[in-house]
Amino acid sequence: MAENLNYAYTGVPYDKDNYTSDSISWCYNNDASNCAKYGRLYTWAAAMDSVGTWTINGKGCGFRNECSPTYPVRGVCPEGWHLPSETEWDSLRTAVGGGAIAGKMLKSTSGWDDFNGEHINCTDAYAFSVLPAGFRVYEGSFKDEGLHAHFWSSTEYELEGAYYAYYTLWYSYLDKASLYNSYKYSGLSVRCVKD
């Protein structure tokens, strides 16, 4: 998928720990124009389809719940697509020359500026078109639009599986793309992979 997912849950019966069907994905700064530009930002539970609306592969996966998903996890992705695992993200980084240059190779040629507002030269050599969508912090604020891109994986972080999952981070000011872990309540972008 060459763009971030922009699917809003509507009518999904989900209510856990103050997260309802209206608060499991967001537009950056709650501005609909940012969804059109960057796609939505999802909690890990939403990305995994923890309520099992479409498939049971990610059912029960969410904050404070360790899970053993059945791979591939369709999650919130359209039929015939799935949420990439940590291994799939790492394979993508390797395929384009390694993590040290993956950011430069896969980031969009526009939208990336450094801290001084100077344009960053990215090649988007594989038409993957990563945009700096930023993320939603678990307590509700939004950060890093124009500076970073964060994408969920379907893989829990092994040391804190109930609370954290792996994601990829793309920097405006560096050529690399890195794998880290994030709090599952955070709002990150989603890219889907064709089955």
State what each model feature region is.
Residues 1-195:
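Conserved positions within compact, well-structured domain cores
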